[in-house]
């Protein structure tokens, strides 16, 4: 079993619906988390998850803030520092690594 982390803190549903943060607050959470993890990733590879739900951040009035956060991350992808992908693609990649790289393989 391969587990790709599901984020509780960088998750639009509890942040916006339960804690009543604004969509701009959520976008700042995304970029702050990203910037800090980018710095930490200089020492070891890291995975950053963002949980998005269409009924929350997918609402048109919230999309602009999300777009700004994603564009911030894309600038780093375009210079080869990050890989933006989906959990299934990470799982496929991990399963193709040499035996012993992934614990339990």
Describe each region flagged by the PLM:
Residues 1-44, 103:
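Active-site-adjacent pocket scaffolds in enzyme catalytic domains
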Residues 31-105:
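C-terminal domain-boundary segment and adjacent tail
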């Amino acid at each position: 079993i391969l587990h790709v982390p599901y984020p509780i803190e960088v998750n639009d549903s509890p942040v916006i619906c339960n804690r009543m943060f604004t969509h701009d607050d959520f976008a700042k959470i995304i970029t702050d988390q990203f910037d800090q993890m980018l710095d930490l990733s200089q020492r070891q590879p890291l995975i950053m998850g963002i949980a998005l739900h269409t009924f929350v951040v997918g609402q048109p009035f919230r999309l602009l803030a999300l777009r700004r956060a994603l564009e911030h991350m894309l600038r780093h992808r375009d210079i080869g520092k990050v890989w933006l992908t989906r959990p299934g693609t990470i799982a496929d990649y991990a399963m193709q690594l040499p035996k012993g790289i992934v614990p339990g393989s």
